[in-house]
Amino acid sequence: MADQLIRATAAEGGIRAVGVITTRLTEEARQRHKLSYVATAALGRTMAAGLLMASSMKRSGSRVNVRVKGDGPLGGILVDAGLDGTVRGYVGNPSIELPPNAKGKLDVGGAVGGGYLYVVRDVGYGYPYSSTVELVSGEIGDDVAHYLVNSEQTPSALVLGVFVGAGGVTAAGGLLIQVLPKAARDEALVETLESRVAGLAGFTPLLQAGKNLTEIFSDLLGDMGLEIFSERQMLRFHCGCSFDRVLGALKILGEAELQDMIVKDNGAEATCDFCSNVYQASSDQLAQLIADLQAESTVSG
């Protein structure tokens, strides 16, 4: 099943629902970063959460940055997700592995530990909106739902899941269901919705049972006036790094530092944190950067 996002409403627009399947992009992240089982689950959940949050943004080019900063051995998570369906991310310690938790599942909460969730929404106007909440469990889903309730005053249910088998990621994605103000006053509706979401065994078991997003929404909201939008948005792991950007970053270091790299290392090597792409600049290319800096200095002088 292709990585995709679908949107739906229910209760005459009082309920907003978004679902994502992120199996392939999570597997790509696992391979790029050589992630352990628990690191794959942690990053995969956070990437799905980032895409779900970005889906509510309106302006083209809008992006959400999600940073999980905990005191656990994972060393933190950073995800960048866009309204355009692209996402990238990394963890501090990709090789960390822990025993299963008390429920026999991957111990994402133990890997993350206690700390804070930082969310930055950039709608492209140059004034990003940022908010911080304390982590509830470190399991990502609880933490992002806590953020949505406290920072955006929107009651939200978030179900995230990543299943990692011996051969890699076989199922990943999530659901975001939000009760908007026009429906929040209907206590019976809210209680029914909460009960159904709480009754889910998780997200990945639904995918493994062969259900698609449309069927999952129908099971949860089918008797609440469900309307599923026909458009399916494709999702993918994508990083905007490039060799030109690396050269630009190296140039900022200045002549002395560049000359030192030429003498000591015969060039420079840089690895992108987000995608693990490795870029190598030769001594000749560094020398050209120095020449460019000298030319610019002459012109400005």
UniProtKB/Swiss-Prot annotation:
Signal peptide: none annotated. One of its GO terms (molecular function) is protein folding chaperone. The keyword Metal-binding does not apply. It comes from the Bacteria. GO terms for cellular component: cytoplasm. It is found in: Cytoplasm. SUPFAM superfamilies: Hsp33 domain (SSF64397), HSP33 redox switch-like (SSF118352). GO terms for biological process: protein refolding. Disulfide bonds join 239-241, 272-275. Keywords: Chaperone, Cytoplasm, Disulfide bond, Redox-active center, Zinc. InterPro entries: Heat_shock_Hsp33, Heat_shock_Hsp33_C, Heat_shock_Hsp33_N. Redox regulated molecular chaperone. Protects both thermally unfolding and oxidatively damaged proteins from irreversible aggregation. Plays an important role in the bacterial defense system toward oxidative stress. Belongs to the HSP33 family. NCBIfam families: PRK00114.1. This is 33 kDa chaperonin. It comes from Nostoc punctiforme (strain ATCC 29133 / PCC 73102). The lineage of its organism: Bacteria, Bacillati, Cyanobacteriota, Cyanophyceae, Nostocales.
